[in-house]
Amino acid sequence: MNDRVIRILLDSFFKILIPGLQYTIPLTIITFAIGLLIAIAVAIVRVYKIKVIDQIVRFYVWVFRGTPLLVQLFIIFYGLPNIGIQLSAWVAAIITFSLNVGAYCSETLRGAILSVDKTQKEAALSIGMTNNQAMFYVILPQAFKNAISPLFNSLIALVKDTSLAANITVVEMFMAAQRIAANTYEPFELYCEVAVIYLIFCTALTYLQKYCEERLSRRG
């Protein structure tokens, strides 16, 4: 690696990191939060088997788990304008990633809810709680505890998936690296650099996952 490449990497580091702080991290946080809310609603509908709505959410989960995320991005950003729905790249990315996360996490939460011992609900009902209260105050907290590892896995996967937003012109880290590579003609080194930054983000989340798991295990 010659001095020119080292200088390019040093000069480009913050040019790649800043879009990460401005776009990649906010995109991850916003879409995971919205996706988690969608997942909770879908999981509850699936568990209670609410008529009509259950069939709709089953179809939604089937579609978003069965099609590539990149195709979903293109349909929402490039396809919807054909029926008069015009979205900015940022909004299209948020909608797509949120729906995708919601579909995957709903199955995680549904399994976690079903894994909670039925006696927990019976005990909650016996002290005067309604079905809804038992779900939100007793069952869901235990379900989240059971699902902490797969939910973190989904979050880590989402961090990496945000790089796909570059395909619809969202200037996140990968797009920033592409632009610098086009000017410097050093794509290999720059893509390795952006890979290292993604690795740092994901490693931090892995340690956070481990910390949360240890805290929950100590609480029993």
Task: Locate each region found by the language model.
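Transmembrane alpha-helices and adjacent helix-loop boundaries
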Residues: M1-G220
